[in-house]
Amino acid sequence: MQRAVPAAIALLVTASVLITRQSGQPATQLRCRPSAEIWIIRHGEKAANASRTLDLDLSPAGVDRAKNLERLVTSGEWPRFQAVYATSPSAPPFVRREYETVAPLAEALDIQINVSFGAFETEALAADAMRTARSLAAADDCRSPAVLIAWEHCRIPKLRRALGCDTGRCRACWSDLDYDSVDRFRVFADGGVDVLPPTSEGFGGGETTDFAYAMCVDKESEEPGLDCVPPY
C-alpha cells in the first residue's frame, strides 16, 4: 500500500518542478544572486621615518606581515583570491611596499599581480577591479570568488568611494598606525555593491590615536580628492 503524500509536501514539490520547467534551471539556482568580494588591505609596515622622506620597501615587520597573509590564504582562513592588485612600482611615487605585501600570497596562488595602476590612478583601479569582480561572479556559479587590492592607506577612502560607498565610515581616514584592518565589498554580477563588515589580518598593528591621521590630512593639499574625514 502506498502512503499518502502530505498536501504541503506535494504542493512544494509541484511548485519546484513548475519553476524548474519554466526557467530551464534547477529551482535552487534561482535563489542565487552571483557575486564576488573585493578585499582591500594596506601595505605592510615600513621603517620609522621622522624625516618624512620616501620609503620604498617593507621593514622586517612588514615582510613578516606579508608572510602571514600567505599563511591566511594557504590555510583556508582567507579566500583563494582569483585576482590581486597592487600599486605599480614603476609609476610615481615608485614605492614597492604594496607589491611586496602581496607577493608571497600571489606566488602561493600562482597568479600574477596586476600592477597596471599607479598610486594616483585610484579611480581607474576601482573601475577595473569592479569589472574583474563582476566577470568572476558571473562565471563562478555563486561560489563568491574574491579579489584582493593592496593600496596606500591615505588613498583607501578614495578607493572606497570609487567602489560606491560614501557613508561616514567609508569617508573616514585610515589611521597612520593601522596596518591590520581589512575592508570588504560584495559586488553583484547584475549590478550593485554591498559594504560588508570590516575584518582584520589578526597580525597586530591596528592601533590608532587621535593624532594618527596627520599624514593623510596633510596629503589633501598635495592631491585633490583625498578628502578623508578624521574620526574625532
Name what the model sees in each region.
Residues 150-152:
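Short beta-strand segments
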Residues 13-29:
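N-terminal signal peptide
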Residues 3, 23, 194-195:
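Compositionally biased, intrinsically disordered/low-complexity regions enriched for serine, proline
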Residues 1-10:
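Classical eukaryotic N-terminal signal peptides for Sec-dependent ER targeting/secretion
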Residues 27-143, 155-232:
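Active-site-proximal alpha-helix that buttresses catalytic centers in soluble enzyme cores
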Residues 145-148:
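Short SAM/SAH-binding signature in class I
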